[in-house]
UniProtKB/Swiss-Prot annotation:
Family: Belongs to the gamma-glutamyltransferase family.
PANTHER family, A to Z: GLUTATHIONE HYDROLASE LIGHT CHAIN 2-RELATED (PTHR45027:SF5), PUTATIVE GLUTATHIONE HYDROLASE LIGHT CHAIN (PTHR45027)
Expression sites (tissue/organ): Placenta and sigmoid tissues.
Organism the protein comes from: Homo sapiens (Human)
One GO MF term attached to the UniProt entry: glutathione hydrolase activity
UniProt-recorded name of the protein: Glutathione hydrolase light chain 2
InterPro entries, alphabetized: GGT_CS, GGT_lsub_C, GGT_peptidase, GGT_ssub, Ntn_hydrolases_N
Phylogenetic lineage: Eukaryota, Metazoa, Chordata, Craniata, Vertebrata
Active site: 37 (nucleophile)
Length: 218
């Protein structure tokens, strides 16, 4: 999945002027969205960086807690596929994601650290909103707070619907529809991004207001 050949195959399927039906992309798996997830981004004085995401998967995980520690148990096994069983998100089973010893399930979590050719970190950000925040910051020149707060869109192929946040620019929605996207307004926010960016004056951090929380530094 990290090879240049695989990336080139995916890139060749992208059309600037139109979207395509699901069969065009020849999908072999689908990635569900996690519900009970938190992310932490940290950069130390010496430039050491940590991007860590933790999850119990669905909201309230398995809805079972330990009677001793009162820790809530996760239901991460639902991220695996099982033959003839459709998961919590309505995603049909995928052979590539079947349960096997020593295997991790597919996940929409995407902790990321980006560095330039000289090893200096230009930025870092999460799944669909992660590349959007990176594009806003690196390509469009938005500061980290604006990049994190910009309205988002999401398409996970199945269902083949492009979900947009309620406050997105209508011109964006119109442009998507001219490319044959079926759009709908998200009932809530689309994921959450926490980001730290190296600037000319030092470091800038942003905590997504979609989920509360604040950046902190010393």
């Amino acid at each position: 999945m990290t090879s240049e050949f695989f990336a080139a195959q995916l890139r060749a399927q992208i059309s600037d002027d139109t979207t395509h039906p699901i069969s065009y992309y020849k999908p072999e798996f689908y990635t569900p969205v996690d519900g009970g997830t938190a992310h932490l981004s940290v950069v130390a004085e010496d430039g050491s960086a940590v991007s860590a995401t933790s999850t119990i998967n669905l909201y309230f995980g398995s809805k079972v807690r330990s009677p001793v520690s009162e820790i809530l148990f996760n239901d991460e096994m639902d991220d695996f596929s099982s033959p003839n069983i459709t998961n919590e998100f309505g995603v049909p089973p995928s052979p590539a994601n079947f349960i096997q010893p020593g295997k991790q399930p597919l996940s929409s979590m995407c902790p990321t650290i980006m560095v330039g050719q000289d090893g200096q970190p230009p930025s870092h950000a999460d799944h669909t909103p992660m590349p959007q925040a990176i594009i806003y910051n690196l390509w469009f020149g938005y500061d980290v707070k604006r990049a994190v707060e910009e309205p988002r869109l999401h398409n996970q192929l199945l269902p083949n619907v492009t979900t947009v946040e309620r406050n997105i620019d209508q011109a964006v929605t119109a442009a998507l529809e001219t490319r044959h996207h079926h759009t709908q307004i998200a009932s809530t926010f689309i994921a959450v991004v926490q980001a730290i960016v190296r600037t000319a004056g030092g470091w800038a951090a942003a905590s997504d207001s979609r989920k509360g929380g604040e950046p902190a530094g010393y």
